[in-house]
Amino acid sequence: MKILLSLVALLASVLFVQLGSGSLGPLDALSGKALNFSSIEIGLIGSAHFLGFMIGCYITPLLISRVGHSRTFASLASLGAISALAHMVLPDAFWWIILRILSGMSVAGTYTIIEIWIQPKLNNQNRGKITGVYRLVDISGTLMAQAMIALLEPATFIAYNIIAVMCCLSILPLSLTTSLPPNIPHKIRLRPIMVFQFSPLAAYGVLVAGLSNSIFRTMGALYASYSGLKISQVALFLVFGILGGALSQVPAGWIAAVSYTHLRAHET
């Protein structure tokens, strides 16, 4: 419990990051339709987010090693706010692709920093429980972000301003936390192949989940809209798509912790 209390600020930052980034994808799809973008253009805008996400995974460790965790987080969260605000200033599919690359970098970077901050507090006894709570907050933020779609009018300044505010709010809890950041490593190398070497099953599971989730989160709102659903119904469609995952996180974490304890008991 003490460890969870020490992570409240970080979890609050996670919540605000997800409130902003989780609503941007569906809003872009609906706004693209309102601005007469083609389905291909809307798909490319959604794909650009994940391209930016991959870029963010590579550049964030470099930024951390240069300026530290807090400054890197603030910079990347600000980048997310700027990219959201610029959408209606540049209402063109080409520029939206560029902006979604920037927002993807922002999301990847902010999550990387938060998870680096959390990792030193984990051990084999509490890892499953804390990870479950972390994912519950993360997916609950996604859930609320999908519900926000019912309140955000597509292709309007106010809708994108609200998303930018969420990005800015994510900076406050982490900036004010009393939890000390991890030590800054002198050299960081990102080697994705090591994930497959350590746990092939987990790596392939994440790959499959990423393929399915990215399609749903990018094009789900567009599909629902073209099916004749109202904006409020589109939001419900997206909410129920995320709800099952949100409800499963804490039980999965507890099962992982119990399974590890039993495994260790049998080994001894």
Residue ranges, per PLM feature:
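Helix-loop boundary and gating motifs at the non-cytosolic
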Residues: 5-50, 214-223
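C-terminal ends and interior cores of transmembrane alpha-helices
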Residues: 79-91
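Cytoplasmic helix-loop-helix junction between adjacent transmembrane helices
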Residues: 103-136
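C-terminal membrane-cytosol helix-exit motif in multi-pass small-molecule transporters
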Residues: 164-183
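Conserved small/polar residues in nucleotide/adenosyl-binding loops
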Residues: 261-268
